[in-house]
């Protein structure tokens, strides 16, 4: 029988270095204390939270194995799997490199200014030892001078910069804790007694870090109290890793951290700067969008990282992991992200309703909502959501956007009935599952138990059906003013446009719209318009550079000819604007007595 401390020693040990960042290569050393005779190793094909097979092994190169300095036979058996013929009585060592030049939050990146990696991109999985302790070394000597380390991993022995050894209880924890490297800005705060760190790379000199910390703290405290009241969250510390860049936006959730990307211009600036964010945030402010992203990824620490689909009880890193519940885990998170900005006091009722309006109109202007249910969209995420094409809006619906409307509709239905709220349902699911895997039946049971009636009809229609949700009627009943208004011109035309500055290009032709009836196609370059002769007005032809020029050129006319270029041919397409204008909705505060319990409980 071994002493207890022996079980704490890492069975699998990685050493990651970046000796030459300009070549975008991380070097990795891997030591396995007790390998199998035919030790299998593999690199994941996907990263949890991003539902697409990304083939991370395409960037792994120079893999070699040895024992006591002598080469060991290594055979590749699949696209992402290798077998080493090892002596089980001796440690097995492997060396390899990983090319890292993807600036997204999903993979790995390395240049002279910054390093970042997810374990799914760098750390080979040692089959048979996934549940044993793992260690990761980030030695100061293997990193550029002046770089620091930020990660959610537990430090075992590190210096002031964070360089040194980190531990994970198993492979799942190791790859669920990304690592940020570089000369980043770093700040910290406590939320409900729990330490939080916020690091930001790529920020300008006028960046107002203190405002970001204060606003993030309010979001975190509001969410912790939402789930636990005065109790602690399910993590002992949390790390935000934000990279500010010229272009880009996104985030990926992890068990006690998140990796985020925003545009540099969206960061708050210190007071007195020309473009400093005003104290009162608007729905159109980039900083409001950033705070919504922070709120979204933080909420995921509960909803998807712990409370998760039953199919994700144990992750299979070698293939797709299907679930029909992303409408709940991503959609409900999308409902709560902006709502928590309101409840934290960062935005007012009017601003929140403008954010909600944007999501509502986006769904209403997506023809695919009548073809694909949100449950099917969840299951199809692996082949559709991340593979956007010109027909995507016609054939699919977003489980983020429509899932958020499902959450809204359920919440307002519960509030109308007067027995419970969706907040109560979320906490009920957390308590009864122990913060673990759930099925759709668990959601239905919680709704029935707390709502004191069966919600099977709503789930069948809203989740598994393709009819529009009663969101507008429910909003009106809750005290929201919902007024129809004219949709944007492109939507009236049944088009989505891409304006690259020098050409006006059709990106998507929406099903059933005026553009489809006219014979316009995705990829057409819209050059100009011809208007027919009218009494006292001759026929005219105009160059069209921006779509918003069209109303002035048409005047009261509803019919015109679009001049487009397609495959080096010039075509005329007769367009008839619809008599019944496509509508959107404008939301604004109405009855504060009924709004207050929902928006600011």
Regions found by a protein language model. Give the residues of each.
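Early extracytoplasmic/domain-onset interaction patches
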Residues: 2-46
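A surface-exposed beta-strand-loop module
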Residues: 18-19, 49-110, 126
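Short, hydrophobic/aromatic-enriched beta-strand segments in well-ordered soluble domains
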Residues: 28-34, 43-45, 84-110, 134-142, ...
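Zn2+-dependent metallopeptidase catalytic core
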Residues: 56-64, 131-150, 154, 163-172, ...
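Extended, low-hydrophobicity, Ser/Thr/Pro/Gly-biased non-transmembrane segments
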Residues: 95-181
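Juxtacatalytic substrate-recognition/specificity segment
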Residues: 185-326
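Post-HExxH zinc-binding segment in Zn-dependent metallohydrolases
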Residues: 258-265, 306-307, 318-369, 563
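C-terminal recognition in membrane/secretory proteostasis and scaffolding
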Residues: 337-338, 347-601
């Amino acid at each position: 029988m071994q002493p207890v401390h022996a079980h704490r020693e890492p069975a699998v040990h990685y050493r990651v270095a970046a000796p030459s960042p300009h070549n975008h290569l991380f070097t990795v050393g891997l030591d396995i204390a007790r390998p199998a005779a035919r030790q299998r190793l593999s690199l994941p094909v996907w990263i949890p939270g991003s539902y697409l097979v990304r083939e991370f092994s395409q960037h792994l190169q120079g893999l070699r194995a040895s024992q006591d300095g002598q080469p060991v036979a290594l055979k590749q058996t699949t696209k992402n799997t290798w077998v080493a013929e090892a002596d089980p009585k001796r440690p097995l060592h492997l060396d390899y490199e990983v090319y890292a030049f993807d600036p997204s939050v999903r993979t790995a990146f390395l240049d002279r200014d910054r390093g970042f990696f997810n374990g799914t991109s760098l750390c080979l999985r040692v089959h048979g030892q996934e549940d044993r302790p793992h260690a990761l070394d980030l030695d100061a000597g293997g990193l550029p001078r002046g770089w620091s380390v930020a990660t959610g991993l537990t430090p075992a022995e590190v210096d002031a910069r964070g360089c040194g050894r980190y531990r994970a209880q198993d492979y799942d924890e190791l790859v669920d804790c990304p690592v940020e490297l570089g000369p980043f800005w770093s700040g910290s705060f406590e939320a409900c007694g729990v330490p939080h760190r916020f690091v930001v790379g790529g920020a300008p000199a006028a960046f107002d870090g203190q405002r970001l910390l204060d606003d993030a703290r309010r979001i975190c405290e509001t969410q912790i109290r939402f789930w636990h009241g005065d109790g602690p969250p399910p993590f002992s510390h949390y790390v935000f890793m934000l990279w500010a860049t010229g272009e880009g936006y996104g985030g990926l959730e992890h068990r006690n951290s998140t990796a985020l990307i925003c545009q540099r211009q969206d960061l708050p600036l210190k007071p007195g700067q020309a473009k400093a964010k005003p104290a009162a945030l608007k729905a159109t402010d980039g900083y409001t969008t950033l705070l919504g992203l922070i709120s979204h990824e933080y909420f995921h620490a509960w909803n998807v990282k712990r409370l998760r689909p039953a199919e994700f009880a144990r992750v299979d890193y070698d293939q797709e992991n299907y679930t029909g519940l992303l409408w709940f885990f991503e959609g409900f998170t999308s409902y709560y992200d902006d709502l928590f900005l309101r409840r934290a006091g960062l935005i007012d009722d009017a601003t929140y309703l403008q954010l909600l309006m944007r999501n509502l109109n986006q769904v209403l202007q997506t023809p695919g909502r009548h073809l694909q249910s949100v449950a099917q969209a969840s299951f199809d995420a692996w082949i559709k959501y991340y593979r956007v094409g010109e027909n995507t809006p016609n054939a699919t619906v977003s489980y983020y956007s429509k899932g958020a409307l499902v959450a809204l509709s359920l919440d307002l239905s519960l509030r109308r009935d007067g027995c419970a709220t969706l907040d109560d349902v979320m906490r009920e699911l957390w308590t009864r599952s122990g913060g673990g895997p759930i099925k759709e039946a668990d959601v239905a049971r919680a709704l029935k138990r707390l709502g004191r009636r069966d919600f099977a009809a709503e789930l069948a229609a809203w989740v598994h059906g393709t009819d529009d949700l009663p969101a507008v009627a429910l909003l009106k009943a809750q005290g929201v003013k919902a007024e129809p208004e004219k949709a944007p011109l492109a939507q009236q035309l049944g088009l989505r446009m891409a304006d690259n500055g020098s050409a006006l290009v059709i990106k998507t032709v929406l099903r059933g719209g005026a553009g489809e009836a006219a014979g316009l196609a995705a990829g057409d370059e819209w050059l100009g318009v011809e208007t027919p002769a009218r009494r006292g007005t001759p026929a005219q032809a105009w160059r069209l550079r921006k779509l918003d020029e069209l109303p002035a050129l048409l005047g009261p006319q509803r019919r015109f000819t679009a001049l487009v270029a397609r495959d080096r041919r010039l075509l005329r397409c007769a367009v008839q604007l619809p008599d019944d204008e496509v509508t959107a909705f404008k939301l604004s505060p109405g009855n504060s007595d009924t709004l207050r319990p929902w928006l600011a409980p």
